[in-house]
Amino acid sequence: MYCLLIRKERNMERKKGEKLPRDFYLRDALTVARDLLGKILVHQTPQGILKGKIVEVEAYMGKQDAAAHSCKVRSPRTEVQYGVGGFAYIYLIYGMYYCMNIVSNREEIPEVVLLRALEPLEGLEQMQQRRNVRRQQDLCNGPGKLCSAMDIQKAHYGIDLCGHEIYLEEGEPVTEEEIGVSKQINIDYAGEAKDYEWRFFLKDNP
């Protein structure tokens, strides 16, 4: 099992709303996962801008993580994970919902962070139309829901998150006291990995 080393990323020079640089993603997924809390996911769509604050994530640590898609055979599906960090790994679950992961670390180290929930910030009307849901709390409170609300699809597999269509911005600072930690969800098949506490979330976010 990995030992979690908290490595604080130096972001004092980044202002709120500034796009995250490539270096942010070139760290292990556990570090990136914690630092993603409070950051803003942005999608520039033809219908307008969609924004949501990241409030829940899970880290998947590659070859030594039985819950990771990249644990076993390298395949076309997981190929993007073997590149440098800062690209999107999108996959379909249950034949109907997409999930968005952020590739982390350096080349040939296939680690990702799954986005599990957002707090909607901008483009609420478009999100409500896409989800056919009115309550703001229900728009992005799950990995499939957030992809639907944010209009993230299979076509976005491999998109560069340092580009201009889908990217992440600096948000309000998050302290260690605000972060909750738990086991990941729905990975009972993953042997000892099911007990790894690699899910991180903002404690006071509904």
Name the predicted role of every residue range.
Residues R7-R10:
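Basic polycationic patches enriched in arginine
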